[in-house]
Amino acid sequence: VSGTGLHTAGDVPLPGPDELPVYRTEDILRRSADDGAFRALLGECQRVLGHTLSSADLNTLFGIYDRLGMTAETILLLIHHCADKLRRRYGEGRLPTMRAIEKEAFYWANREILTAPQAEEYLAALARRDEEMEKVRHALSLTGRDLTPTERKYIESWLSMGYGAEALAIAYDRTVVGTGKLAWAYMDKIVKSWYEKRKYNK
């Protein structure tokens, strides 16, 4: 965690698990003038979000930079990731809020994704998982709509066990033969049974 000299002990409460301190706007702007990395981060964040940050949003962005131990480059990757995720799901024009960016920042920080190389490795792993998820969607004939949270949870669980689309297509076939439909709990029992026997997984 980096110290900035903008606040001293007792000035603001220490941040909790999902809580950033409160800064004075003039102190943030002064830091922006002196810190080229944060100034560039602020400019790019406003460009991505399409508007000048409010005082509250400015406080959030600076809090992420000041307290979570992330480099400016890492935060830029995080912001672009949040924007790309919404764009893929809803199309152009849907942009993340600073609150959503803050939540994602805490998620990364709690997993010690603090440097650009760590962020790039994490994002590459996410891309591979999304690619696998898409293959499984097609194998289970789940096209034309988004997965529900429960469906996503099942598939992520199976992928984490080492089962890809090819193996899950077999489980899907057996599920439909046994139940006449895609019964998630039934298919889950099949996959877990395989896992216990170390069958079909990678």
Tell me what each language-model feature is.
Residues 3-202:
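Electrostatic interaction modules used in gene-expression and signaling proteins
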